[in-house]
Design a protein with these regions (language model features):
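Short, Lys/Arg-enriched N-terminal segments with co-localized hydrophobic residues
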Residues: 1-3, 15-33
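Cationic, low-complexity basic patches in intrinsically disordered or flexible, solvent-exposed regions
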Residues: 6, 11
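Alpha-helical protein-protein interaction elements
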Residues: 12-13, 17, 24, 63, ...
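N-terminal glycine-rich FAD/FM-binding segment characteristic of electron-transfer flavoproteins
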Residues: 30-312
Length: 312
């Protein structure tokens, strides 16, 4: 990383503009360093084409189109916004099968700097407990390879599991401050190592300031996800994510990963039936006539009676 400074230099009779380059050194040596932000994403089945195996109550992923989890993209967008505004290194991580590389490349096309795919048959069948264990250890390994992690972004939940447990689970395992259901990142103060956010509550908005390192779970209201640029797409096409398997985590407790480390039991799953409802258009000479027809049809349907209405 470099700092560029422009100056004027005499060359004979000419004065030319030049750029001086100096190293940007790490804060441990008394200088400055950019924030390191990790974004956790998941490749999920397209919810419009979900199928379920009735025997083991699991999602059938083979042959089903996959996308980046919707909420995770908002976490990535916020990390990229911070990168654009004040400088940051953004590393994206996912645990999943080899085809999840496609989702990581999409994140690279949007502006992420590095991507890590954690994939192994030993991780298969993981519930949220086992997943948070592996992801937390992956973030530890990322910090060893690319420097300490200041912020972690996750989506509030995934479209397939829908539990909202992995983000807080990772924060607990890493002993990070956690800010869930975030709708706005107000300020990231690198000098004070403080972050201020708005959190969505059932009865309002909570304004919270806490210290880095921290983990944030993102809501869709946080931002609008950008589109990939042409240079980003070109870089993504050439990019090869870092791939880690169980062999890269010799200290992992095998009893806490994959199916063995997943105490969750799914009793039953099903795909909701999509019922087709025939609509009816009501027309009349004026608004009053249309309203009269609508009221008459509602009474004929006995809906008001079922709801306890007895008329005026």
């Amino acid at each position: 990383l470099f700092l560029f400074k422009r100056g004027l230099v005499k060359q004979g009779r000419r004065t030319v503009s030049v750029v001086f380059v100096s190293d940007l050194f790490h804060k441990v040596s008394g200088g400055f360093s950019m924030l390191h932000i990790v974004v956790c994403i998941k490749q999920v089945p397209d919810s419009r084409e979900i199928r379920i195996d009735p025997k083991n109550n699991t999602l059938i992923r083979q042959g089903v189109p996959s996308i980046v989890n919707f909420y995770d993209l908002h976490g990535l967008e916020e990390a990229l916004r911070i990168k654009d505004e004040q400088g940051a290194r953004v590393t994206v991580v996912t645990m999943g099968p080899p085809p999840a590389e496609k989702s990581l490349k999409e994140c690279i096309s949007l502006g992420a700097d590095e991507a890590v795919l954690v994939t192994d048959r030993g991780f298969a069948g993981a519930d949220t407990l086992a997943t948070s264990y592996v992801v937390a250890n992956t973030i530890k390994k990322i910090s060893e390879h690319w420097g300490p992690v200041d912020m972690v972004f996750c989506g509030k939940q995934t479209l397939d599991g829908d539990t909202g447990q992995v983000g807080p689970g990772v924060a607990c395992r890493l002993d990070l401050e956690q800010l869930t259901y975030v709708t706005k990142v107000v300020k990231v103060d690198e000098e004070r190592r403080k972050v201020t956010v708005h959190r969505h509550l059932e009865d309002g908005i909570e304004v919270v300031e806490t210290s880095m390192p921290l983990l944030i779970t993102a809501l869709k209201e946080l931002n609008k996800v950008r589109r990939a640029s042409l240079p980003g797409m070109i870089r993504a096409a050439r990019y090869k994510p870092t791939v880690w398997t169980t062999a890269d985590f010799p200290k992992l407790d095998k009893a806490q990963i994959g199916l063995k480390g997943s105490p969750t039991i799914v009793a039953k799953t099903w795909v909701p039936e999509i019922r087709s409802i025939n609509g009816e258009r009501i027309e009349g000479e004026d608004e009053a006539a249309v309203a009269d027809q609508l009221i008459a049809k509602l009474w004929d349907s006995e809906l008001p009676t079922r709801m306890g209405w007895t008329g005026v």
